[in-house]
A protein has these predicted regions:
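Hydrophobic, helix-prone linear segments
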Residues: 1-16, 20, 24-26, 64-65, ...
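Basic, amphipathic "hinge/linker" alpha-helix immediately C-terminal to the N-terminal HTH DNA-binding motif
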Residues: 67-88, 157-176
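Amphipathic alpha-helical dimerization/coiled-coil segments
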Residues: 83-127, 171-207
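Short, hydrophobic-biased segments on the C-terminal half of alpha helices
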Residues: 23-26, 51-55, 140-144
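Transmembrane alpha-helices
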Residues: 39, 44, 50, 54, ...
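N-terminal helix-turn-helix DNA-binding core of bacterial DNA-binding proteins
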Residues: 2-49, 60, 71-73, 97-135
Length: 207
């Protein structure tokens, strides 16, 4: 997926936090501190990956140790981010879907285009000048897998396919419209707070 996103954020902090496990960790710690084994069990992640993510989130001052160094809790900055993301999880959108959609260049734009009305596939793809049909098809397939959109066939000659938002897709678009600007502001604050060279970018294969 493209590293450039719908909020115009493509820096290392954005890439680091908007990954599958980082989002899941922030959301899991929203309701209170947890120890390492509890987090690993809840997330179903290996100890190696969890350790790496916890170190990086700690380096960003989003989490800190608690219980005398035996557990982890959110900092004020981490809590602010988790409070922005938590409403999506409460509506049934998983952390994995959140990061996949928000980090993608095209998925948020596609969802927003479908916000007002259903659209034919060719019409929807044509509304984005820079997207190829191959990339468009891949993104639509993913959005269907995430149960954010649905498609239906119009019995015409030739047969045409039309797309619309699922209820969960409407939840995501509503969240983007209501909280997108604030999310961008929080990430810019976080980016400014980092000293040059302080954050090591995460390799794509661990996201």
């Amino acid at each position: 997926m493209a590293s450039e996103d719908w909020l115009g954020l493509n820096g290392s902090v954005w890439r680091e936090v908007m990954c599958k496990w980082s989002v899941a960790i922030l959301v899991s710690l929203h309701d209170g501190p947890m120890n390492f084994s509890g987090l690993a069990k809840r997330l179903g992640v290996s100890n190696k990956v969890l350790s790496k993510k916890l170190r990086r989130l700690s380096g960003l001052s989003l989490i800190s140790e608690s219980y005398g160094g035996k557990g982890y809790m959110l900092t004020d900055a981490g809590l602010e981010l988790s409070q922005l993301l938590k409403p999506l999880v409460a509506e049934g959108v998983s952390p994995a879907v959140i990061q996949a959609v928000l980090r993608c260049k095209w998925m948020p734009q596609i969802l927003r285009a479908l916000w007002l009305r259903d659209m034919f596939a060719s019409e929807l793809a044509g509304s984005f000048e820079e997207i190829s049909w191959k990339v468009f098809s891949e993104r639509m397939k993913k959005l269907e897998e995430f149960q954010l959109i649905h498609r239906y066939v119009i019995p015409s000659h030739p047969v045409r396919v039309k797309y619309g938002l699922e209820a969960r897709g409407r939840v995501v678009v509503r969240w983007m419209l209501q909280r997108g600007a604030l999310l961008r502001e929080k990430f810019l604050e976080l980016q400014r707070s980092q000293r040059p060279g302080e954050l090591i970018q995460a390799p794509d294969n661990v996201l």
